[in-house]
Amino acid sequence: MHTVEDMLVEKNYSKCPLKKRPVNYQFEAPQNHSNTPNEPQDLCVKKMEILEENPSEELINVSDCCEDEGVDVDHTDDEHIEEEDEDVDVDVDSDPNQTQAAALAAAAAVAAAAAASVVVPTPTYPKYPWNNFHMSPYTAEFYRTINQQGHQILPLRGDLIAPSSPSDSLGSLSPPPHHYLHGRASSVSPPMRSEIIHRPIGVRQHRFLPYPQMPGYPSLGGYTHTHHHHAPISPAYSENSYYSMRSMTPESSCSSSLPEDLSLKHKNLNLNLNTSQPGEQAAAKTGDMSPETMPNASAKKDKNQPPRYQCPDCQKSYSTFSGLTKHQQFHCPAAEGNQVKKSFSCKDCDKTYVSLGALKMHIRTHTLPCKCNLCGKAFSRPWLLQGHIRTHTGEKPFSCQHCHRAFADRSNLRAHLQTHSDIKKYSCTSCSKTFSRMSLLTKHSEGGCPGGSAGSSSSSELNYAGYAEP
């Protein structure tokens, strides 16, 4: 039976590129040092660092804190550790027989050397007693910087406001927790500032103001201002990052906490009130400034508005010249051209109309364009012809809700409804009788009324009953 090696030897790879030629590897079974034999095999070839965890202490990089305080730190051990790290790197290609146990032993040696070089530093800031908590934790260099001319910078609100944790409210002097990893290099982040101390909640009303107090204002003790709670400052905070952050923020954010300087406005208001009349002073105090008490209001209003075009005949003004021209041409009654109004007269009769549309509607009464195909009767309106056709077909779509009578035209139904009402539309002037239709009133006045005549009767409404044209 041929093995894999025999098969590879038989094939000729002289003309095959090197990167495509098969490589023959020989692996040895690693020894299992774990207590549990059922765990999967760890095939990781990278360097593994096993760090001994100590739950009671946190390891902090000494170089991060000491460099900030001006303490010289010897970095020779760091170079030695880096050389050891380079020696411990496992080269799988050069020595394939090296086992995993040797790699773990080398990693443990590196971890022990790193743990020996790390020392937990003691805090360098003083312990303030309870009665001195109003003192500011900033250094003298910080005050010299902010007191320079043209650099009135307000400290961060996060430094002057108490933290939200309950431990700080009890007056704890421990520095904020640092989450540095074991053996972390100093080049990863800027050094931690040891003078940043969170203040307890009970000292919120004591705050330092680096800007001078302006004259003419009451003491800032009674001045209340809502503080904006900022996010807690990270351990990577430094003085350079503080000034870079303050320079990036606009000046309005810094000046928003200061009250507006209204001294000039108050002085001008007092001068105006003293020179004005007593009635104007009372109106200004109450806030009701009427147009009568402000003589200059109308003048300012006229200056701001564009000029208006006034009609010389009726004194009306318009914002545009086209509006004034249209007013003079059509609407102005005092204009010379509008004194004699246009009139449209009918050629067949003596009637006159103001508009041309009304004259055209009147001409239809003479021409009668709507004619019935059954009887040849003509009408001036199409709806009158439609009501006439219903008399031929017998259709009566309009019915009375009281007596169930039906009518072909709506006007006939409207006249019929008057018979059911107590008050009729048409009344006789002689006997005060009322009728639902004009024809009934005429019949009554001509033959039935004792003291009436044909000319004495009058009506208050038009007749809706007939279809015939006048």
Curated annotation (Swiss-Prot):
Q: InterPro entries, from UniProt?
A: Snail/Krueppel_Znf, Znf_C2H2_sf, Znf_C2H2_type
Residue ranges covered by zinc fingers (C2H2-type):
309-331, 344-366, 370-392, 398-420, 426-449
Q: Per its UniProt record, what Gene3D superfamilies does this chain match?
A: Classic Zinc Finger
Q: Chief localization class?
A: nucleus
Q: Which biological process, per GO, is one annotated for this protein? A: maintenance of imaginal histoblast diploidy
SUPFAM superfamilies linked to this entry: beta-beta-alpha zinc fingers
Q: Where in the cell is it found?
A: Nucleus
PROSITE patterns, A to Z: ZINC_FINGER_C2H2_1, ZINC_FINGER_C2H2_2
Recite the UniProt keywords alphabetically: Activator, Developmental protein, Differentiation, DNA-binding, Metal-binding, Neurogenesis, Nucleus, Repeat, Repressor, Transcription, Transcription regulation, Zinc, Zinc-finger
**Which Gene Ontology terms cover its molecular function?**
DNA binding; DNA-binding transcription factor activity, RNA polymerase II-specific; DNA-binding transcription repressor activity, RNA polymerase II-specific; RNA polymerase II cis-regulatory region sequence-specific DNA binding; RNA polymerase II transcription regulatory region sequence-specific DNA binding; zinc ion binding
Q: Please tell me in which tissues this protein is expressed.
A: Expression is complex and dynamic. In early embryogenesis, expression begins on the dorsal side of the embryo. Expressed in a pattern of longitudinal stripes early in germband elongation. Later in embryogenesis, expression is in cells that correspond to the wing, haltere, leg and genital imaginal disks and the abdominal histoblasts. In the embryonic leg disk, expression is restricted to imaginal cells. Also expressed in the central nervous system (CNS), tracheae and head of stage 14 embryos.
CC terms in the record's Gene Ontology section: nucleus
Region of interest (Disordered), residue spans = 271-309, 448-470
Q: Quote the annotated effect of residue 387 to E.
A: In esg[VS8]; 50-fold reduction of affinity for DNA binding
Question: Which family would the database say this protein is a member of?
Answer: Belongs to the snail C2H2-type zinc-finger protein family.
Q: What does this protein do?
A: Transcription factor that can both stimulate and repress transcription. Binds to the consensus DNA sequence 5'-A/GCAGGTG-3'. Regulates cell motility and adhesion during tracheal morphogenesis by stimulating transcription of the DE-cadherin gene shg at branch tips, thereby promoting tracheal tube fusion. Maintains diploidy in imaginal cells by inhibiting the transcription of genes required for endoreplication. Required for development of the genital disk and acts as an intrinsic determinant of wing cell fate. The somatic protein is required for maintenance of male germ cells.
Task: Indicate what this protein is called per its UniProt record.
Answer: Protein escargot
Species name for this entry? Answer: Drosophila melanogaster (Fruit fly)
Q: What is the lineage of its organism?
A: Eukaryota, Metazoa, Ecdysozoa, Arthropoda, Hexapoda
Gene name, Swiss-Prot/TrEMBL: esg
